[in-house]
């Protein structure tokens, strides 16, 4: 931060040291001081496409599926806009069939990929022959903000750029979606808005990028209100909290992870994948949960029910129950 006083410099160092982020990736910002939203959006489209292409190619290769077999394309992003968007560019560059069905989940925030997964599951339930490619790409660094607004300082310390993708098909003999073929099944999902929290988190379009509203009250509200809702939903599925040993929690930041630990009565080891992704990549908004699920799929010794959680403006809480079963 330019022209920081010694006191301000110490504040920045303290916030960054406590962010839980050791490494992250960011695209170069436009070559101007405090660029306009229009300048930032001009940088979004080509960079988003580059990251999305890499993520989609990796997902297709991992699933053993040709791009031409994809019947549905779902894209997720809250950090940029454009029409035609990067989804059409994916069709041309992967390439996908020209008649692929496209759905975009836009501007929902960090929990956007949960909604994308829900849509993917609906597609494969409606048509068992469907083959869905889901891609979430976020360029959070485009919206770095100058100045000493506390919300902006925290956001600058946490957020990063990244893209993740998965392939979803109908699971053999089950009415559920399967991520990257057979090893991670989406069994059920749900969503709620925590009462009285509408003003605590926001993502606002302003003249110089998108601006984050992030109240310090968010973790305490999650800690107080999460458990009763989760217990009720899990009971409807015949499960209790102690029966869920594996968790995939969107790491909005260390305090949000700590709030989930407190509310759900978890041990730190149960969210180690979330902590590791935050440390290695930062908070990549909607793409982050796909990084965590990828590690869940490929980590030995993690089988059985898994509960994924995401948080966003509202305060919205998204939950997904997944079944981890390693391929034979």
How should these model regions be labeled?
Residues 82-89, 134-154, 188-206, 253-262, ...:
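Active-site-adjacent elements of ketosynthase-type condensing enzymes
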Residues 38-44, 75, 102-105, 151-153, ...:
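A short glycine/serine-rich beta->alpha loop
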Residues 75, 133-134, 167, 249, ...:
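Structural beta-sheet core signal
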Residues 1-46, 131, 140, 146-224, ...:
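Condensing-enzyme catalytic core mediating Claisen C-C bond formation in acyl metabolism
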Residues 61-67, 123-131, 169-182, 238:
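Secondary-structure boundary elements
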Residues 53, 60, 78-80, 97-128, ...:
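Claisen-condensing/thiolase-fold acyl-transfer catalytic domains that form or cleave C-C bonds
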Residues 67-71, 98-101, 126-132, 153-154, ...:
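Short coil/turn connectors at secondary-structure junctions
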Residues 15, 19-96, 104-107, 241-257:
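Conserved beta-ketoacyl condensing-enzyme motif
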């Amino acid at each position: 931060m330019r022209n920081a006083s010694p006191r301000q410099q110490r504040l920045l160092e303290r916030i960054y040291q406590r962010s839980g982020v050791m490494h992250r990736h960011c695209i170069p910002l436009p070559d101007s001081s405090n660029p306009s939203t229009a300048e930032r959006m001009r940088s979004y489209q080509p960079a988003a496409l580059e990251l999305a292409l890499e993520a989609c190619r990796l997902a297709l290769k991992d699933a053993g599926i040709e791009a031409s077999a994809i019947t549905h394309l779902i894209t997720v992003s809250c950090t940029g806009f454009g029409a035609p968007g990067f989804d059409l560019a994916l069709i041309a560059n992967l390439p996908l069939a020209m008649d692929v069905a496209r759905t975009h989940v836009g501007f929902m925030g960090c929990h956007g990929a949960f909604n994308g997964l829900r849509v993917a599951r609906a597609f494969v339930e409606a048509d068992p022959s469907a083959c869905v490619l889901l891609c979430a790409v976020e360029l959070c660094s485009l919206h770095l903000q100058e100045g000493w607004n506390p919300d902006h300082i925290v956001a600058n310390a946490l957020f990063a750029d990244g893209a993740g993708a998965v392939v979803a098909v109908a699971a053999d003999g089950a009415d559920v979606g399967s991520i990257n073929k057979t090893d991670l099944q989406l069994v059920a999902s749900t969503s709620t808005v925590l009462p009285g929290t509408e003003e605590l988190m926001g993502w606002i379009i302003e003249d110089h990028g998108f601006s984050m509203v992030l109240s310090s009250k968010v973790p305490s509200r999650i800690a107080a209100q999460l458990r009763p809702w989760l217990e009720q939903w899990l009971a409807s599925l015949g499960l209790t909290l102690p029966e869920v040993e594996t968790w995939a929690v969107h790491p909005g930041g260390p305090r949000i992870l700590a709030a989930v630990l407190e509310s759900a009565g978890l041990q730190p080891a149960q969210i180690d994948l979330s902590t590791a992704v935050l440390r290695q990549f930062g908070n990549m908004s909607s793409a982050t949960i796909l990084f965590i699920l990828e590690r869940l799929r490929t980590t030995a010794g993690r089988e059985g029910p898994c509960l994924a959680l995401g948080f966003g403006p509202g305060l919205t809480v998204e939950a997904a129950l997944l079944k981890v079963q390693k391929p034979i």
